[in-house]
């Protein structure tokens, strides 16, 4: 079963991170070690997170230290569409695709010059700003995206707890991300691309 989430659906969703967006899809669960910025695990069909493969523009994306992808490193403003394939694909991708595959396609350049931006704010001091531009001329195209996220955090302990001392543990979160995609269309269906992501 394949689910495709296009750009218009991404913009209409309430989720502000990739994990929150995926969690709204049937057959996908996630759990996190805390609030914003903490390691989150995405699970498909009830299997461990290490059995869900994440591809960004066809390239495997993972963490050598965590053993699973860092799902929230990619800002949603950089995403053009998401394809979710549920079920075992280990014959094609290996054991990390037993649960399924999440394939993300980032935004390409657009004819002429297109600029976009977004600002949002929420509870617990959450605020986010994103901007980007897309350009294409002849065989060349480029897309650049910038995003800044800030969150004051919240306390996971309960001030009204019956036992023990209350010790607030507000864990704030700051994230800056930049993504770049350059493309050159060659003869026929041949294309050369360079991708960069820093978060």
Over which residues does each language-model region extend?
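Non-catalytic regulatory/gating segments with a bias toward low-complexity or hydrophobic composition
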Residues: 22, 82-84, 102-104
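Residues that define the transmembrane beta-barrel architecture of outer-membrane proteins
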Residues: 96-98, 125-129, 174-178
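Periplasmic-side early beta-strands and strand-to-turn transitions of outer-membrane beta-barrels
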Residues: 90, 103, 111-112, 120, ...
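Extracytoplasmic beta-strand/coil segments of soluble accessory domains associated
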Residues: 19-63, 80
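Short, charged/polar, Gly/Pro-enriched secondary-structure boundary elements
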Residues: 49-52, 108-115
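Extracytoplasmic/secreted envelope proteins and their assembly/folding machinery
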Residues: 2, 7, 15-22, 71, ...
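N-terminal periplasmic "start-of-domain" segments of outer-membrane beta-barrel proteins
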Residues: 1-13, 41, 49
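Short acidic/polar hinge/loop motifs at secondary-structure boundaries
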Residues: 59-86
């Amino acid at each position: 079963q394949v689910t495709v989430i296009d750009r218009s659906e991404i913009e209409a969703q309430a989720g502000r991170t990739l994990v929150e967006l995926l969690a709204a899809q049937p057959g996908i669960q996630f759990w996190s070690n805390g609030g914003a910025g903490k390691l989150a695990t995405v699970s498909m069909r009830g299997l461990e997170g290490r059995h869900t493969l994440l591809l960004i523009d066809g390239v495997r994306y993972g963490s050598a230290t965590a053993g699973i992808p860092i799902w929230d490193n990619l800002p949603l403003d950089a995403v053009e569409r998401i394809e979710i394939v549920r079920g075992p694909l280990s014959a094609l991708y290996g054991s990390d695709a037993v649960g399924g595959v999440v394939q993300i396609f980032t935004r390409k350049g657009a004819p002429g010059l297109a600029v976009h931006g977004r600002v949002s704010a929420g509870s617990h001091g959450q605020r986010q700003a994103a901007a980007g531009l897309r350009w294409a001329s002849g065989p060349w195209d480029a897309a650049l995206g910038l995003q800044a996220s800030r969150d004051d955090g919240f306390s996971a302990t309960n001030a009204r707890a019956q036992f023990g001392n209350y010790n607030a543990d507000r864990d704030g979160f700051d994230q800056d991300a930049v993504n770049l995609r350059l493309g050159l269309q060659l003869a026929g269906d041949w294309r050369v691309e360079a991708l960069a992501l820093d978060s």
